[in-house]
UniProtKB/Swiss-Prot annotation:
<dbReference type="Pfam" id="PF00646">
    <property type="entry name" value="F-box"/>
</dbReference>
<dbReference type="InterPro" id="IPR036047">
    <property type="entry name" value="F-box-like_dom_sf"/>
</dbReference>
<dbReference type="Pfam" id="PF08268">
    <property type="entry name" value="FBA_3"/>
</dbReference>
<dbReference type="InterPro" id="IPR017451">
    <property type="entry name" value="F-box-assoc_interact_dom"/>
</dbReference>
<dbReference type="InterPro" id="IPR013187">
    <property type="entry name" value="F-box-assoc_dom_typ3"/>
</dbReference>
<feature type="domain" description="F-box">
    <location>
        <begin position="47"/>
        <end position="92"/>
    </location>
</feature>
<dbReference type="InterPro" id="IPR001810">
    <property type="entry name" value="F-box_dom"/>
</dbReference>
<protein>
    <recommendedName>
        <fullName>Putative F-box protein At4g38870</fullName>
    </recommendedName>
</protein>
């Protein structure tokens, strides 16, 4: 049985809340951490509508709810609030949330407004053909103010959390709760910074990685990684820790993907920093490794997830709608396998049509192994996303309702297909 990690204050509140349901002989005048489990086994029941429910059963019920009622249930009692805010329960809720259908998140950066627009789309499961009508999807749009656009970068959603901002004020944002936290400032001076966010499924920890690049010495404006700092979210000492391990010389690129506790990001290596490579960061052990890529690896490809593995997707022949996939089979030995797929007719015609020529593949659906094509700009005529099942040669799409009627002077900085409800309180 899992012992809840309550603080002393929470334990006192829990005792007062639960003591009403304890048998008279079981009530104790003292409450210490060592007796927490014993006391919990003795009562493990709270009164809900005159019914007695074990605490473990309450947790099993609560974790299956959506986030909105859980937020309301914080006001039910101090005991319920302690349960919902407990890290162990938050991990249970996240694991349950990962089993549900994922949402699609667009993050747009509007330079004129100095803001970030994030829209959450509920995917349509209706398969369509090129002659059938599209189905619509509901969405929620958030407007997040960002006071500066200087060197601002945006990391894709990782289990519901988004990291964005300039080096001076990096922000972790939870679209579900609409809460954010500003991380401690990184002193980088005029040097550029790449930030990434990863998740360790074993410990349930989120970690933010910041890599400070040196001043570029070459015409390609790429600088070597000089300093690497890591911050663990949700800890009492939320400060940056310097990584002193020797890492392979590389210049990081702001494109990353976290799969099963390993954060992958693109990089350039070589004396001229013009050779493509992929770096891996084990979120739990905080170890870096260099992954060799195929000799004909294309620099304009996209990191993706395919059948639970890291993959690199690219156009083999764009005019004919041929998609190529490099799939990482063995990271330690740099072994890759290659697959090619012909896009279904609807997707192939969409990528070449005039009205949808701004669409490009942005991500893959980890649950269905589908490639997702999304618009690069926010406009009512470009408000659809196309899902291509390469294995089954099928296509489905949805149309987002309520998109802006005018062009926004912005690009889609990131598109994530794995958005889930996250109970983490920032």
């Amino acid at each position: 049985m899992k012992t809840l990690g309550f603080s002393p204050k929470q334990k006192f509140c829990a005792r007062r809340q639960t003591q009403r349901w304890l048998p008279e002989g079981d009530r104790s005048s003292s409450f210490t951490p060592s007796t927490m489990e014993t006391q919990r086994k003795k009562f493990t029941k709270v009164s809900v509508n005159s019914e007695l429910l074990p605490v473990d059963l309450i947790m099993e019920i609560l974790k299956k709810l959506s986030l909105k009622p859980l937020i309301r249930f914080l006001c039910v009692s101090k005991l319920w609030a302690s349960i919902i805010r407990d890290p162990y329960f938050m991990k249970l809720f996240l694991n349950e949330s990962l089993k549900r259908p994922k949402s699609l998140v667009f993050v747009f950066r509007a330079q004129s407004l100095g803001s970030i627009f994030s829209s959450v789309h509920l995917k349509s499961t209706r398969e369509i053909s090129s002659s059938s009508s599209s189905s619509s999807a509901s969405s929620i749009t958030y407007h997040v103010t960002c006071y500066t656009q200087q060197r601002m970068t945006i990391s894709p959603s990782v289990h519901g959390l988004i990291c964005y901002g300039p080096p001076s004020s990096l922000v972790i944002y939870n679209p579900c709760t609409r809460r954010s936290i500003t991380l401690p400032k990184i002193k980088a001076g005029r040097r550029a910074i790449n930030q990434y966010i990863g998740y360790d499924p074993l410990d349930g920890n989120y970690k933010v990685v910041c890599i400070t690049r040196g001043m570029p010495m070459l015409r390609n404006r790429r600088g070597l990684a000089e300093e690497i700092q890591v911050l663990t979210l949700g800890t009492r000492d939320s400060s940056w820790r310097m990584i002193h391990d020797i890492i392979p010389p590389h210049s990081p690129v702001s494109e990353e993907l976290c799969i099963n506790g390993v954060l992958y990001y693109r990089a350039f290596i070589g004396t001229k920093l013009n050779e493509s490579a992929i770096m891996s960061f084990d979120v739990r052990s905080e170890k870096f490794d260099l992954i060799k890529v195929p000799c004909n690896f294309r620099s304009f490809s996209k990191l993706a997830k395919y059948e639970g593995k890291l993959a690199v997707i690219f156009y083999e022949k764009k005019t004919s709608g041929i998609i190529g996939l490099w799939i990482l089979e063995d990271a330690s030995n740099g072994e890759w396998s290659k697959k090619t797929f012909a896009l279904p007719n609807l997707a192939a015609s969409s990528t070449n049509s005039r009205i949808l020529k701004l669409q490009k593949f942005r991500t893959t659906d980890a649950d269905t192994c589908e490639i997702i094509f999304t618009p690069s700009y926010a406009h009512s005529s470009l408000s659809s996303a196309i899902y291509c099942d390469l294995k089954e040669n099928k296509v489905r799409k949805f149309v987002k309702e309520g998109w802006t009627e005018n062009y926004l002077p912005c690009n889609a900085d990131s598109v994530s297909s794995t958005q889930v409800e996250n109970l983490m309180f920032l």
